[in-house]
């Protein structure tokens, strides 16, 4: 009986811990790099609370979970955070900027891309359709007199790893990639080079800082946990 009681208490504690854990989601890539430290803190016992951190390949996997209240917090692209704020009428709010400029144009096997203008007539591989990478790329192309719908061909992939795989099989490939994928791809293929830093290109044409990722929280959770 005593053993059974201890087992029951242990199970209850486990359920309570799971229930009380802060449910966080992040995307594989730069928007979540700042959250990785939470895992090591939890493992070594220095975290101030329990965390349940889940990583996803695409932002559209996270959105419905936030909307249904199955997540408390998430690291997502900045433009998506703005959309969710509007859709939920403030029910999901940004609490911190976690990622600034981390996007680059990478070229394989050449040095033909020296400026945004050089992208005209080329095919560009990219992640992030409907999120920050797409909007940044389209904004910069337009700002440099290039129609993103007519003057270039943009092929979108759901994850950065798919872009790097496609680059490996494409001669003279050009891609928009975030860190740390730029570095990882370069280590696997020494013919890749960083052609353009999109933060630098942004600063040439915009008077605002390029913010690519933010951390959002459900308003209800924030009100229940003000600390």
What are these regions (language model features)?
Residues 1-16:
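Short, low-complexity, disordered segments immediately C-terminal to signal peptides
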Residues 13-30, 49-55, 93, 121-126, ...:
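Short, well-ordered beta-strand elements
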Residues 15, 108-124, 219-226:
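Flexible hinge/capping segments at coil-to-helix
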Residues 21-22, 26-61, 65-67, 84-87, ...:
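Short, polar/charged alpha-helical segment
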Residues 53-65, 77-79, 148-169, 180:
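Short helix-initiation/N-cap motifs at beta->coil->alpha
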Residues 79-80, 160-227:
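Pocket-lining segment of extracytoplasmic ligand-binding domains
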Residues 94-114, 208-219:
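Hydrophobic/proline-rich hinge and linker segments of small-molecule sensing/allosteric domains
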């Amino acid at each position: 009986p005593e053993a059974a009681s201890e087992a029951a208490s242990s199970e209850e504690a486990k359920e309570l811990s799971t229930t009380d854990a802060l449910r966080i989601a992040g995307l594989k890539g730069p928007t979540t790099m700042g959250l990785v430290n939470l895992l090591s803190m939890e493992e070594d016992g220095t975290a101030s609370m329990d965390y349940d951190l889940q990583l996803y390949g695409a932002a559209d996997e996270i959105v419905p979970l936030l909307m249904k209240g199955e997540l408390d917090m998430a690291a997502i692209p900045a433009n998506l955070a703005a959309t969710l704020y509007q859709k939920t009428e403030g029910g999901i709010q940004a609490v911190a900027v976690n990622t600034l400029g981390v996007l680059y144009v990478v070229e394989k096997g050449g040095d033909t891309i020296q400026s945004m203008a050089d992208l005209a007539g080329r095919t560009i591989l990219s992640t992030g359709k409907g999120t920050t990478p797409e909007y940044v790329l389209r904004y910069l192309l337009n700002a440099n007199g290039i129609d993103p719908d007519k003057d270039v061909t943009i092929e979108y992939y759901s994850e950065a790893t798919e872009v790097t795989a496609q680059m490996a099989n494409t001669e003279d490939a050009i891609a928009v990639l975030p860190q740390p994928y730029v570095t990882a791809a370069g280590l696997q293929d020494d013919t890749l080079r960083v052609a353009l830093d999109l933060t630098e290109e942004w600063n040439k044409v915009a008077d605002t800082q390029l913010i690519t990722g933010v951390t959002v929280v459900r308003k209800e959770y924030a009100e229940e946990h003000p600390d």
